[in-house]
């Protein structure tokens, strides 16, 4: 009998992005022998953490702050970071999407539908959102399209609209 490999998945379950990441991990895990996933449910502003005493073999996590990094580092097992957030000193292996290719695909999607005047909306004070915005603007400009940018306020209770 093969050994069961226990993997914790610490990804925000309240967002479409997080659920798609979990779906991708689960799809991969079903093709492996002996993988057992523990998905830690959480909302957007909730702290993602391993339960006390969890005895696993590794973690796949969206590491968004140094506190989480330190906790997972102390765990002493392999960790894969799926966050686009770049934190100084975080040295786990990281898997993220290709921002440039995604931006080019988005611009191509609009181009195929006849749009030439595009816009990007995102919270500018989030570094990974800024990278997405820059890539989208560059892809639009490379096609000769105009691109407006709107950065709504992130302050709680203020929609920015």
Regions found by a protein language model. Give the residues of each.
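Bacterial carbohydrate/catabolite-sensing allosteric modules
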Residues: 1-58, 68-161
């Amino acid at each position: 009998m093969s050994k069961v490999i226990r993997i914790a998945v610490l990804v925000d379950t309240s967002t479409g992005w997080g659920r798609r990441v979990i779906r991708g991990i689960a799809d991969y895990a079903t093709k492996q022998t002996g993988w057992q996933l523990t998905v830690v449910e959480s909302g957007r502003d909730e702290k993602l953490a391993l339960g006390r005493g969890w005895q696993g073999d590794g973690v796949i996590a969206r590491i968004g702050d140094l506190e989480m990094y330190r906790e997972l580092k102390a765990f002493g097992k392999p960790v894969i970071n799926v966050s686009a957030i770049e934190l100084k000193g975080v040295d786990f292996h990281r898997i993220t999407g290709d921002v440039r290719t995604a931006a080019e695909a988005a611009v191509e999607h609009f181009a195929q539908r006849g749009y030439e005047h595009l816009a990007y909306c995102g919270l500018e004070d989030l570094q990974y959102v800024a990278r997405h915005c820059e890539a989208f603007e560059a892809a639009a400009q490379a096609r000769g399209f105009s691109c407006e940018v709107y950065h709504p306020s992130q302050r709680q209770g203020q929609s920015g609209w």
